[in-house]
Design a protein with these regions (language model features):
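Serine-dependent acyl-ester chemistry module
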Residues: 149-359, 374-389, 412, 416-510, ...
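A conserved position within tetratricopeptide repeats
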Residues: 306, 340, 505, 539-540, ...
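Hydrophobic membrane-insertion alpha-helices, especially the h-region
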Residues: 4-19
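TPR/TPR-like (Sel1-like) alpha-helical repeat modules
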Residues: 329-344, 566-580, 587
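Register position in tetratricopeptide repeats
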Residues: 291, 325, 524, 558, ...
């Protein structure tokens, strides 16, 4: 009796505290999807606080805002796309691989309705994707596509992360995450963070520059443990998919090998100062020869440096670049892969990550899992067999051409698992016809092409990209691409772009990403009233998202409609209370409308 009381009383108290915290509204839901009625229809919308379990709130990344019908419409084939920022479509998800995949499938099978739901999120890794998979299993998916692996070292609980403990055991990670699903656990997390803090955690988002101080050697014990955690998470993700009876397309991960030099390189700790000095002398001599175009002579000197330390990643990149210049493509590929694998700032899926993925594919042969070696297939279709700047804006994020190529690769495997009822109604069309149709569906305007290259240019103009030896040529390439778009732009281009948006929206009026691009087009070209109109339509479609409300408010303010602008800023803040830009704009309007001498205007 006493034992029962000793057990039940604390449990009762904990349950009472948990209930009390929920009643007063403390904490956040850890579900990926939340129910919401939009225009009288039931939808599931992404929870902007879903990643609070994995990131400090100020650094948390949000999923795409697009709503999904709570009950899948009859005749719809729903595909969940799982992954990180590369699958998300960074730097612009409106032209991401999921968007191209959906467009391509609808071109090939016009009698069917496809819905590719992108549940990929920037900066996450397999520790986050496993809970996402468990949620997707509840929502009537017909297929999953998994493209993940770039963030295993720097994402939550990775070996080089700034968000949490570094590479703890899977048991520890899952226990902590389970505890944070409770309001008590969230309260404990807040108290502990408040008491101890973490000076290593940035106050604001800084991209991959945040991880620059957490460099990892090739055989760092934390790095090795992170690989095993990835293996365990991947096995469980596939197990969840099998349990849901969903066919899964699992892909290896490609990256920029040719034109993205390592971000950081490390020498072994046991290298003597004398040997290091000799290595540095040889490296500089090789560099001088390489710059002068004497590639074979440079290779000979680099080989001497490699005899001292072959694992310095920048050295392998220089060796690979010289081999490529000499048309020794096979050896160049090996060297450039080794450069990536030894990069001390590990933000690209490396050989060991892709081997774990291939192991999982082979292990599940004959099951509901279908493998695709996208990394190899992308190499096969790249100049000299080595992926580079033609397909990637920087280290891992695809250009529009890269996303389209990956979508074509994935579509081949998707087609193998589609029901005969769908495949009987269509099939692959001529490549040029498919490309044109996809670009028309997504409204790939000249204005958007230049806009996204401009975003990429801004990104690589900051750390850690500026420290790359490949930086100057990548900067030049971005500028050249923007100039190339300019060369195709004529006085009639804005009208043509406008019509392209209109036609695409007539076909897909509920496409919020497409309408968002249209709103930006109007705003940037000075057609502010039309920008407001498109923004208001987005707000109606996405009442749960703060960013369209902020956009409408900011354009209203430029039109001098301060009352309406303030209303939209307030709406944005009701949705996302911690929205500093909206708070700042609202305060600016209040100051403008109030003078101590005159009172309220």
């Amino acid at each position: 009796m006493r034992l029962a009381a000793a057990t039940l009383v604390p449990l009762f108290l904990l349950g009472f505290l948990e209930l009390g915290l929920r009643v007063v509204g403390y904490g956040y839901s850890t579900r990926l999807f939340l129910p919401l009625q939009i225009a009288g229809e039931n939808f599931l919308v992404p929870n902007e606080k879903f990643t609070y379990r994995f990131f400090p709130p100020g650094l948390a990344r949000a999923p795409l805002s697009s709503p999904m019908a709570a009950i899948k419409p009859k005749g719809t084939y729903r595909i969940f796309l799982l992954g990180e920022s590369a699958a998300y479509g960074d730097p612009d998800p409106s032209f991401g691989v999921g968007r191209y995949l959906e467009a391509l499938l609808e071109v090939r099978y016009p009698t069917s309705d496809f819905e590719v739901v992108c549940v990929a999120i920037t900066a996450i890794n397999s520790h986050v994707i496993l809970p996402i998979a468990k949620e997707c299993a509840k929502h009537d998916g017909d297929m999953w596509v998994i493209y993940m692996g770039n963030n295993e070292m720097v994402g939550p609980y990775g070996a080089g992360t700034v968000f949490s403990e570094k590479a703890p055991s899977l048991e520890f990670v899952r226990s902590v995450l389970a505890l944070k699903t409770t309001r008590l656990g969230q309260l404990m997390d807040q108290v502990i963070t408040g008491l101890h803090g973490n000076s290593a955690t940035p106050e604001s988002w800084g991209g991959i520059a945040m991880f620059s101080k957490n460099q990892l050697s090739y055989d760092d014990p934390n790095r090795l443990r992170a690989y095993e955690n990835f293996r365990g998470n991947l096995d469980d993700i596939l197990r969840v998919g099998k349990g849901a009876g969903v066919p899964v397309i699992l892909s290896t991960v490609a990256c920029n090998l040719r034109d993205s030099s390592p971000f950081a390189s490390l020498h072994p700790t046991n290298l003597t100062s004398k040997r290091l000095e000799e290595w540095q002398r040889l490296f500089q001599a090789g560099n001088d020869l390489e710059v002068s175009g004497s590639f074979q002579a440079a290779l000979d000197i680099y080989a001497e440096a490699a005899a001292i330390d072959a694992d310095f990643s920048e050295l392998q990149f220089r060796i690979g670049s010289c081999q490529l210049a000499l048309n020794d493509n096979a050896r160049a590929l090996e060297s450039l892969e080794r450069a990536r694998d030894n990069d001390a700032l590990s933000v690209r899926a490396d050989t060991r990550i892709n081997k774990i993925i291939m192991d999982a594919i082979h292990k599940n042969t004959g099951s509901s899992v279908t493998g695709v070696d996208a990394a190899q297939l992308i190499s096969d279709q790249s100049p000299n067999g080595i992926p580079g700047k033609e397909l990637f804006y920087e280290h891992v994020h695809f250009t529009m051409a890269g996303n389209y190529l990956l979508a074509r690769i994935l579509a081949e495997k998707v087609a193998e698992r589609l029901p005969a009822l769908i495949t009987a109604g269509g099939g692959e069309r001529p490549a040029e016809e498919e490309s044109t149709a996809c670009n028309r569906r997504l409204a790939v305007t000249l204005w958007d092409q230049k806009r996204v290259w401009d975003v990429a240019l801004g990104r690589i103009s900051g750390a850690p990209f500026t420290a790359q030896s490949s930086h100057a040529r990548n900067l030049q390439y971005c500028k050249a691409r923007m100039q190339e778009v300019d060369s195709r732009t004529t006085p009639s281009s804005p009208a043509h772009d406008d019509q392209m948006y209109k036609s695409a929206l007539e076909a897909e009026p509920n496409d919020s990403l497409l309408r968002w691009n249209y709103a930006q087009f109007f705003e940037r070209t000075g057609r502010l009233s039309e920008a407001v109109k498109q923004g208001e339509l987005i707000c109606e479609r996405l009442p749960h998202a703060s960013w369209p409300h902020y956009f409408v408010g900011s354009v209203m303010a430029r039109l001098g409609k301060t009352t309406e602008a303030a209303d939209y800023f307030q709406r944005a803040l009701r949705i996302t209370p911690d929205f500093p830009q909206a708070s700042k704009e609202l305060e600016r309007i209040r100051r403008r409308n109030f003078s101590p001498a005159q009172g309220t205007k």
